[in-house]
Curated annotation (Swiss-Prot):
This is ATP synthase subunit b, chloroplastic. Its main location: plastid. The chain crosses the membrane at residues 27-49. It comes from the Eukaryota. One of its GO terms (molecular function) is proton-transporting ATP synthase activity, rotational mechanism.
Amino acid sequence: MKNVTDSFVSLGHWPSAGSFGFNTDIFATNPINLSVVLGVLIFFGKGVLSDLLDNRKQRILSTIRNSEELRGGAIEQLEKARARLRKVEIEADEFRVNGYSEIEREKSNLINAAYENLERLENYKNESIHFEQQRAMNQVRQRVFQQALQGALETLNSYLNSELHLRTISANIGMLGTMKNITD
């Protein structure tokens, strides 16, 4: 047994270079130092760390709230834009329908105006033709009358001699004189 106790005692006195043994110096041992450092860090750093985490949590919650508000505003704006789009689409449909009916009305007005113009032109043409026919008939009548008068004058001149001519003039002068006396 003595050997066993000697071996434990000798373990405590081994040189530290390259050997294994227990270090009885509490401040020189690593696990104790680490536990002390960790304990101090936990004790003093707990408040700082919780403050940092609380600040971070508040910033995250604030960012989430802001994002939710922005999302709500965006949804509201989207609904307004959709309502405006529906309104504009309805107005566009009304304009399209009204535009088509206006186009059809203008088309029928133009067609009616064209028919009226054609009718007027047709009437003018007919009047012009009628006028030209009347003028041609008047010219033919004048020509026939002139030729008949010319023929009558030639016939009269061939039958008249100077004595008959003088008697006709005297008779006409007498008739004019009688007419003058009656009118006075």
